[in-house]
């Protein structure tokens, strides 16, 4: 079986329980690009087949799953950077636009792109893209109100009972996903 890892290139963390926001001036206290190069090479040598890349940490989760206020393609520059240091496929995740993703793949800067919430909003998303029917796509509104209910479960962050794990595939704009 292929082995992949959701790999955070830069932690985007300015202190304990303090994630950094886009454009904010801060000193990185977590993994930076230099450490990321070493870690990515180590993972490749250890036998990983692919790195599914984003940014962020537990304290800066919004880089991994960008909400509406995050810039489009917010992780792409760092993902393109790490691609230059490994020979295994590198996939970018995090509020990617189709045009920018396609261009980056065509230019050989990344090997693929991960789209997840788009499929919750519209399970026919890829078919509509391939058939040039993008105007018919029901877009993800990046609200985190349904797909990330576990981020603040019963008033406690990240404390969802595993018994409820079957109810995580939800989407505020797709009633068929509501369970």
What is each model feature region?
Residues 1-179:
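Flavin-dependent oxidoreductase catalytic cores
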């Amino acid at each position: 079986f292929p082995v992949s890892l959701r790999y955070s290139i830069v932690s985007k963390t300015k202190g304990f329980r303090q994630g950094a926001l886009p454009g904010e001036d801060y000193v990185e206290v977590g993994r930076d690009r230099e450490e990321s190069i070493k870690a990515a090479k180590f993972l490749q040598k250890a036998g990983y087949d692919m790195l599914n890349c984003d940014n962020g940490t537990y304290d800066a989760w919004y880089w991994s799953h960008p909400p509406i206020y995050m810039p489009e393609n917010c992780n792409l520059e760092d993902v393109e950077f790490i691609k230059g240091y490994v020979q295994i496929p590198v996939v970018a995740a995090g509020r990617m636009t189709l045009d920018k993703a396609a261009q980056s793949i065509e230019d050989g800067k990344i090997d693929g792109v991960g789209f997840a919430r788009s499929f919750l909003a519209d399970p026919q998303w890829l078919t509509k893209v391939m058939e040039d029917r993008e105007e018919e796509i029901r877009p993800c509104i990046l609200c985190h109100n349904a797909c990330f209910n576990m981020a603040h479960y019963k008033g406690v962050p990240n404390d969802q009972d595993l018994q409820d794990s079957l109810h995580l595939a939800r989407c505020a704009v797709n009633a068929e996903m509501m369970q």
